[in-house]
Structures are given as C-alpha cells and as structure tokens.
Amino acid sequence: MRGWFSSNFKLCLSCIQILIDVARNMSELAAFNERISDLFRLRALQSHLSWDQQTKMPPEGASARGEMMAWLARKHHQSLTDEDLGRIISSLEKQDLSPDDRANVRLMRREYDKASLIPEELVNRMTKASSDAFMAWQEAKSNSDMNSFLPHLRTLVDLTKEKISYLGVESTPYDVLLDDYEVGMGVKDYDPFFSNIRQRLVPLFQAIQSSSTKIPEWPDSVIIPESEQESFCQNVINEIGFDLQAGRVDRAPHPFCSGLWPGDTRLTTRFDETQPFSSIYAAMHEAGHGLYEQGLNQNFAFSPRGQAVSLGVHESQSRFWENMVGRSQSFWDVAQSWYDECFHSKPNYDKSSLYNLVNQVKPSYIRVEADEISYNFHIMLRYEIEKKIFNDNLPVEKIEETWNDLFEDYFGIEVDCASNGCLQDVHWAYAAFGYFPTYTLGNVYAAQLYEAMQEDLGDLNQIISNGDWTPMKTWLNEKIHIHGSLMEPTELIEQATGKKPNSEPFLKYLESKFSQIYQL
C-alpha cells in the first residue's frame, strides 16, 4: 500500500509540475503579446504623426513635431530593447508554439537583436534629423535648391553610417541598409538581379527609341482641373476595392500610403493640371498599397505577424494595380467612360489611343512618371548612388553631380534642375537608404503573381474588361494579404505562385507588350 501511495504521489507531483510549467508558459506568452501590442500601438502613433506632418501640419509646427517624433522614438526603442523582453523571447523560443506565435517570436528576435545594438541617443538624433530634413526637403525641392538640403542630407548620411557601425558589417555597409527593407537581400543578390534586367531591357528600350511607330502624346496646352482628376481617381479607387469606410485619400508633395491598422489606412496623391495621368496612376499605386494594409488579418494587427511581410511584396501590390491592371488595354474598356465623363476639355482619344498614350516609352526625369521599362533604370541609378555613398564613401557634395552623370548615361539626356534630379524623391529626407531596390523587386513579384492569378482565375483581361475586379482583389487577399509576415517574403511568393521568385515573367511581359505596341 505504501508503494502504491508513493508512486501515485510522484505521479501527482509530475502532473502538478506540468500544470505549473504550462501556466508559466501561458503567462510568458501573455506578457509577450502585451508587450508587442504596446510596441505596435506606439508605431501607429508614429505613423499617424508622420502622415499628419506630410498632409495637414502647418509649417510652424515643424520644430515641435520633430521633438514629439524623437520622444516617441525613444519610448519605442526603450520598450523594444528592454532586457525583460529579451528574456521572454529566449524562453518562448524553447517552447512549442502555434505557427502564429512562433512567427511573432521569430520576428521580434530579429528586431530585438538589431535594436539592442543601437544606442538610444542615436535613435533620438536620427528621428529629429529626419523630421527636420523632411521640411527642408519640401522647400529645397520647391526651389530646386540642392545646396539648402545638403546640410540635412550630410547629417542623415553621417548618422546612417554611425548606425551601420553599431550593427556590424558582414559583407558591405550597404547590405546592412538593404536588409532593413528586404530581409536577406544584399549587394550580392541585387547586383546580378539588376544586371540581368539591364541586359534584357536596354536593347528593348533602344529598339523602341528607334521605332517609327507614332504614339499619341498629351498636348501641353490641355489643362485638366484638379477636381476633374479627383473624380477620375475616385472612380478607379472604388473599382479597385479600396474601402473608404476604413481609409481616406489626401494630398501630399510625394504620394504615399500610411497603414495605421487595417481599419485606418490612408492614401495620398498629388495633382498636376497639365499631366492628369500622373495623378491617376499615383492613386492606383497607392490604392494597391492600401488594399494590402486593409487586407491584413485584424486579429494580429498589433503584432509583427500581422504586418506586411516586406517592402518588395508591398511594392508588388501597388505595381500590380498601377501597371498590370492600370496600363493594360482592358483597363480602358472600363476607364474610357471615366475619361469621357470626368474630363471636360480633353482630346477625343479612343481606347486604343489612350492605351498607347499611357504606355509611351521615352526618357523622363521623374521616376514615378516613368514608363514600365525605363522605371527600372531609375531604380538602378539610385541603387548605384547609394552603393557609392555607403560602400565607396562618395561625398555628399558629389551626389548631385554623380546623379546627373549617371542619368545621362542611362537616359541620354541632361538633368535640367535639381527638383527633376536628386531632389525628386522624399526617401533620402527620411534616411530611407536601401529602400529603392524594392521597387523593381516589386515589379518582378507583381508579374509572377499576375501569371499565377491568370492560371487560377482564367483570362484576366476579360475580368478587367468586365469591370468587376473583385476576383483579383480576393485572390490577392487570400494568397498575400491575410498571411502578413507568417512566412519570409520568398516563401510567400513561392507559396502563392508555385515557383521561386524569378525575373523571367516580368521580362517576358515587357518584351511581349511593348513589341506589340511599337511593332518591333
């Protein structure tokens, strides 16, 4: 009897210990989830203040706004690098977690390790410098005055180099920045990636420039008021499926999308009364970003698992709607009526003329207004300059000259002013060095997704022509959006398409489309 009691007593103790361990693990997971929720609420506040700075804030608010942003950045950094969070992450890594929880732990480990290497005071200085630089960039761009922006750019480059020094360099300094925007991607990946695209697109671009095919051009004398452009943009945003009950559209010097959470996603665009298609395609681009943000799983909104997986994938969503849909021939089966109804004093172009007009290939100064082929040359130019800045120590004072020289090499024309050159993008004013390559990566992903979508849904041209684009939006919701950051970017693309990411669908798409337009 004593032996029976002893063995059962030990069994009870084991069961109690198991229950204690389960309770401890549950407690740690609950504490972890509470901490990361607070982190992502802080990020939402930062995002909202940044959106306000670019859309609504009066100029005199700049100084105080910079202080607010720096304070929030400090609080965020303190929370992210808290040693208790690191201890909890280490404990959870040893536990048997659900796929969602495991993704959160994996992603937070990456963030915690990186942030812990960077001093809080550097985060503070970078945030304040970026806020000040944005305001200086707006004025410098407006006046086409690179000299007035140089001190701010120099500060941001110096601070970024300081950040790199803390993070450590395994291959090249620029790799540290590239990895911030597309995890795992570095110079060793992008160099052959861009080389392959350049080898295929340069001959195509040159053949088009030599083509005798005449493409309609928008007359310089035709003015389309902002209100009429806004009506067109509203139609296309509605058609894409962007939910205005969970978002809004405003104006900004440089179009962007700000996702506070799936129920509050904010787009911006800009208008030029002499270039109405610029605003249309900016709206489609940002609405593509917006659909991704609205399509994320709300159950994970305040966690890393619930965020967009990468900038490359994010850009695939914007470029899909802007180019694969918006610059297709079928698009004008729907948009012709918007053109006729919204634009009052306009050339009487038919659908075929409008399709050719918006797909005209020619050298252009502005990246966001470039055609689908030369757009990638704009990205390569920026990639080469950033590589020179951080790997070859190109002086900030030489950036404009280097830009202009490379631009002439790529496009065969001289840059006429700084606002059409190195001042045109907002990215460097936010120290977003390493971001640009994700745009071409997004083009590549978009073409691969389009190809897979067509296999699943049938003729996409017919779907676009019909004017009900819900099947395309739903496919992207199910294949991309809802997964958030559950997987790594390349895993997500492979799962969605059945193939590893590769450039071939994108290159074939461009070669086929523009050979037909220009009768090559």
Feature locations, PLM:
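C-terminal, non-catalytic "cap/extension" segments appended to globular domains
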Residues: 25-28, 44, 60, 64, ...
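Cysteine-centered motifs
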Residues: 12-15
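Post-HExxH zinc-binding segment in Zn-dependent metallohydrolases
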Residues: 307-345
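Divalent metal-coordination and catalytic microenvironments
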Residues: 32, 168, 285, 318, ...
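Contiguous, non-catalytic segments that form substrate-binding/exosite surfaces or channel walls
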Residues: 129-278
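Active-site recognition of the HExxH zinc-binding catalytic motif
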Residues: 281-294, 315-319
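A well-structured
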Residues: 23-183, 511-518
